[in-house]
Amino acid sequence: MTEQQPVAVLGGGSFGTAVANLLAENGVPVRQWMRDPAQAEAMRVNRENPRYLKGIRLHDGVEPVNDLLATLQASELIFVALPSSALRSVLAPHAELLRGKALVSLTKGIEAQSFKLMSQILEEIAPEARIGVLSGPNLAREIAEHALTATVVASEHEDLCQQVQAVLHGRTFRVYASADRFGVELGGALKNVYAIIAGMAVALGMGENTKSMLITRALAEMTRFAVSQGANPMTFLGLAGVGDLIVTCSSPKSRNYQVGYALGQGQSLEEAVSRLGEVAEGVNTLKVLKTKAQQVQVYMPLVAGLHAILFEGRTLNQVIEHLMRAEPKTDVDFISISGFN
């Protein structure tokens, strides 16, 4: 990557815009592609993303564009911040242009029909590309406002991790590296489900003990499932696991938390998602995760409970009663029951 070669950011949402700004602040020329030409033009003229990141000035080094072909041709390092439902359809027609390039997924979601993570879809589309993921406790607005933040870039290609660290690491944004791409990406995708539960709990006035129980049991469920899929359990003790889970389950800025809060106030799922105006990946992830957990026989009572409320007509009180009656098992599943080797 030469000094003047632009880095591409695909997606016009809040996180893509925040990352584009970070890159530009580090002196990297950025082309931010979005599907909507009107949005691209408005961002070029007004130097702001009013739809998704209102009040944050778009750095002069970010060029909003609508020509995907030219963007892919011009860039060797490409950050992909597309919704999970759109990633395959947007990039598959341009597979040849991705050959040999560095693709870093920013999307925390799972493809519904295949239960594939975004990096796995990128591998299918561009098997000769180097693939990585970026995930962690990263609320887009706080990043854009320069709150002190840390994230994890994960890839089996160490040089890709170093490349991402070189362009993104800055005075308010620390980038750590990991080789556990699958674990880091699963942490980012799974925690969205539990953020919905946390938002509901706050709206219903549940106590601090309850919220703490939900977050820690959520971490146990996430880790249990991820280990069944081949991830390293220790990854979930870091930024991409417990770090991301805490911020997403605690902050009203989290989209999935907002959906849960609205549900707890008595809104329907359709109303809660519609009012949000952005994609809440947790709703889609919940559906496929419930099915997958049953297939691989992984015990995930919080996932099953939320699914019962949103899609099976159960009430919250019914689900809580069922959860509290369930047999208590081990606290941490990947160590022996006694805690000793």
From Swiss-Prot:
Sn-glycerol 3-phosphate binds at residues 108, 136, 191, 244, 254-256. It catalyses: sn-glycerol 3-phosphate + NAD(+) = dihydroxyacetone phosphate + NADH + H(+); sn-glycerol 3-phosphate + NADP(+) = dihydroxyacetone phosphate + NADPH + H(+). One of its GO terms (molecular function) is NAD binding. Catalyzes the reduction of the glycolytic intermediate dihydroxyacetone phosphate (DHAP) to sn-glycerol 3-phosphate (G3P), the key precursor for phospholipid synthesis. Pathway: Membrane lipid metabolism; glycerophospholipid metabolism. The active site is at 191 (proton acceptor). The gene is gpsA. It is found in: Cytoplasm. PROSITE patterns: NAD_G3PDH (PS00957). This is Glycerol-3-phosphate dehydrogenase [NAD(P)+]. It comes from the Bacteria. Gene3D superfamilies: N-(1-d-carboxylethyl)-l-norvaline Dehydrogenase, domain 2, NAD(P)-binding Rossmann-like Domain. Keywords: Cytoplasm, Lipid biosynthesis, Lipid metabolism, NAD, NADP, Nucleotide-binding, Oxidoreductase, Phospholipid biosynthesis, Phospholipid metabolism.
